[in-house]
Amino acid sequence: MTLLTSSLLFFSLLTSRLEAIPVLEKSPAHPAHSAHPAHPSHPSPGVRILRAPESLVAPLGDEVVLECETSLQPERFEWSHRSSRSSGAGFKYLRTGTAKANVSQEAAISRLKVLVRQDTLGEYRCVGWFGPLVVTSTIARLELASTSLLGGQESESPLQWRVSAGNSVLWPCGKQVKSNPSASWSYYRNGVEIKPEFIGTNGNIFLSNVSSESSGSYSCQATNPASGERIQLTGSLQLQVTPEQRSQSKSPHLLNGQPNSQEITIREGSSLLLLCPGVGSPPPTVVWSSPDVVGAVKNKRSKVIGHALEISNTRVQDAGTYICFQDNGVRPVLEHYIKVHVEQPPQIVRPPWADLTNEGDRLKLECEATGVPTPEIYWLLNGHSSLDDTEAELSNNFLILHSVLKRHAGYVQCFARNRLGEHSAGTLLQVNPKQIQEPRESGGTHRPKPNQGSKQKQMYPPTPPNVTRLSDESVMLRWMVPRNDGLPIVIFKVQYRMVGKRKNWQTTNDNIPYGKPKWNSELGKSFTASVTDLKPQHTYRFRILAVYSNNDNKESNTSAKFYLQPGAALDPMPVPELLEIEEYSETAVVLHWSLASDADEHLITGYYAYYRPSSSAGEYFKATIEGAHARSFKIAPLETATMYEFKLQSFSAVSASEFSALKQGRTQRPKTSTTEEPTLQMGDRDTTTPSHNETFNMSPMLTGTIGGGAVLILLLISTCLCVCRRRSSRSRGNNPNKPRMAELRDDFVPLGNCSPTKQRQRTRHIHITLNPLAQQQQQALEEKNDTDQDAPYYQRPSSYDYDPGLRRMSSSSLRRSQRTLERAGGSNGSNNGNNNNLNQSAEAGPVENPGKPGRVLMKRPRLSSRSENLSSGSLNSVGV
């Protein structure tokens, strides 16, 4: 059995998401609104008929071969036949290996050998099967070669013509011959074959500027080129040419047997030869004109040769009436009319186009064609006539499906035909099936089973993947999850296997996340993934495994067989050009691109967009853009104020293009608030509270200044605390034997008038609360001090343990304290000139006279040792 090397495209037509692929050519513009576009210079990719079978004419008993070639190797070829003897009958598939038909296949070429018989005459079609997809060729006619005479084999009397020299003679010797195919002609004079002056005279002997040497007996013979049958016409012409001097003057006129007018039918593109009959004496001159065709004579394709007008590469616009005027100065002038018909084979200028259609929707497809005669339009749905479909209606050039059903999914072809041939174009019709809910039990009372709670949500599988070739070793898969209310999907896994015996499914390592639980279209949510490390020239199947939130999984249906062709066997796809990356928002950008030629749209099914942050060297994110007409696409969500790099490639059902050049773009920065906060008017002061965005968007220099100032303030505070602590530690420990209360009293001395101006006097007090546990000991110390009140106070010399520097420091502190007290005492006249307050008793402290106003307390330096005993009491609080 032949290996099914290319069951491609092979898309699951009921659920896959694809674009239309034409069989022959497709209009580059959208069919619904475009003017008649020019046809592309090369055929479109995908499934198409490269070479359709050609019509043949053959004699009975001959064997002919019909050939059909497709762009890709199908799973199988079939041929259908409609006999010419059964009018109105449909096509029937031929059984191969029979006596009258033998089918052979070699790769993507199929050959049908037919023995020409009466029952094998008729129309033939080639049908290629690509999985569920059926592509049908145009019709080839097999006709029987034949040659006959319209008037029978009756003998005609020879014509006798006598003309003066210098005239041109036209004899239509083969006007009664009917031949299929057109006969080839041979001309004879006096039994000797002569070469015609013009090619394409089609059974007309034309002699220009005759002389006496042209006299003789003329005859002609028709030969059927297919069968080789020859017909010797019985009629002949006896021509006698007389010298011009002997002829009398005579106006232009027609000879016996020459037609009064002519009607010629010619195929577009052929050469047309118009001959003007008539003679006169003297020989007339000929002038050509046409009331219907502007510039019919004076153009580059027309040439006047004597009495003949030759038009090369005939066009439809050349059809009309041509008049040749013959004038030799003798009235009347002879006018000869020739009616020209130019026929044109059918050509579809607006092919059908179908998008993904929901089951049950109404679909209207248009197919417009040109041709002369006006072509007839008919439709095939997966190889079956639309006339047999109850949902189909034909209206002028439209096919209307009132309700699209699943059986309509596949290839829809439009055919235009006239007697010159056929032309076809098609589109892929994809049907999105309705979601079928599980039927609920009806009738009776539903009793819940034990351990049965509320109805669980279903697991809706993804659609079968659509496969596109990326390279010789990789493909791109596209699938979607239809809208549903079932269990949410967490991730996808891709599985594939090579077609063949004992080939197991392989699972890729990548986990494809479902993303945000929202639908990105009315139909559902689309996904893409690539599969690498494949082998070219092998056939694969793919499927998608969905993992749900309940940790269960469900598989999609498998894709149709996909044959991975090497890139050398495919035509290159047009590469899109990225024009601009538009900053759409803080989380989105819009890509804008173009094609080198809009005529390339018919080659494209859609586009793949790849993007990643410019600072990243990881894999690209992918987005699929459906439709060949797209020129922009929004990509979201993205990071705010982030630079990304983008690239594009176009794809069809068979392959993908090269990547476009990389282009960078970024998302927008966060927008600052333009709303002012309410202000409180206080005179001319501006007390407007800055908004959050204004504070957040503070300039870096200002932020650095504020931060540096805060650090300096903290350093200053820390330094002051350290200095104060060191001074406090130095001042404690002057007298180790002095009680704590007495020490505090000695530390504060009265200064009568510290300030020279006494505008405001305040009484200040130091309130000391002692520990109750040390109250008795403190009272004993106070009584002891009271007994020593009358004794003179002597300053004890300072004693230091080991450091003489401490002694010098204490002496300096004492001298500074003395100078301070002297200045304070000098300002008070009641001190009797004694500024040395060191002789005061300890009882003169502020604790003894707390109510006396106008007193200022200053701390006195202690000269005792730094070690002090605080076990006698603890200081709880100090009040000023």
UniProtKB/Swiss-Prot annotation:
GO terms for biological process: axon guidance; compound eye development; cuticle pattern formation; homotypic cell-cell adhesion; maintenance of protein location in extracellular region; segment specification; smoothened signaling pathway; wing disc anterior/posterior pattern formation. It holds the Pfam family fn3. It is a single-pass type I membrane protein. Residues 461-567, 575-670 form the Fibronectin type-III domain. Gene3D superfamilies: Immunoglobulins (2.60.40.10). InterPro entries: FN3_dom, FN3_sf, Ig-like_dom, Ig-like_dom_sf, Ig-like_fold, Ig_sub, Ig_sub2. GO terms for molecular function: coreceptor activity; hedgehog family protein binding; heparin binding; patched binding; protein homodimerization activity. It is found in: Membrane. Disulfide bonds join 68-126, 173-220, 276-324, 367-414. Keywords: Disulfide bond, Glycoprotein, Heparin-binding, Immunoglobulin domain, Membrane, Proteoglycan, Repeat, Signal, Transmembrane, Transmembrane helix. Changing residue 806 to M: In strain: Tai18. Mediates response to the active Hedgehog (Hh) protein signal in embryos, functioning upstream or at the level of patched (ptc). PANTHER family: BROTHER OF IHOG, ISOFORM G-RELATED, PROTEIN SIDEKICK. The first fibronectin type-III domain mediates a specific interaction with Hh protein, in vitro. The second fibronectin type-III domain is additionally required for in vivo signaling activity. Homodimer. Heterotetramer; 2 iHog chains bind 2 hh chains when facilitated by heparin, heparin is required to promote high-affinity interactions between hh and iHog. This is Interference hedgehog. It comes from Drosophila yakuba. The lineage of its organism: Eukaryota, Metazoa, Ecdysozoa, Arthropoda, Hexapoda. The gene is iHog.
